[in-house]
Amino acid sequence: MDPRRIWRVALLLLVAGANLQAEERIRLLVQNSPLAGFRYHAGAALWRELRVGDALELAREPDNPHDANAIAVRWRGYKLGYVPRSENAALAWGLDRGTPLRARISALTEHPNPARRVRFEVFVE
């Protein structure tokens, strides 16, 4: 599906829910992904401190020499890795337009393959 179409639907739902009370806000799950590059950043050193549900920060890196759509995933200021290249275009498009995105850890698995250790969810609120 075209990333722009996904974002149009998400933004339409947000506008429709703009008049709801704070406790009735709509939170739309737009992506659930594995964390890319976990073994190359601070993830291994922080593994024991990470918890399912912990908030994550998504930080665009438009000048990244390897991927113009790069989005770093940070936990408490530490870079854990990236949104996978194959899944970052729609999120980059949204972040570049100021869409309020929230992310959190959705799963932690002690797997020998670091690419399978952390999954995260991204929401539009």
Residue positions per predicted region:
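Conserved active-site motif detector
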Residues: 2-125
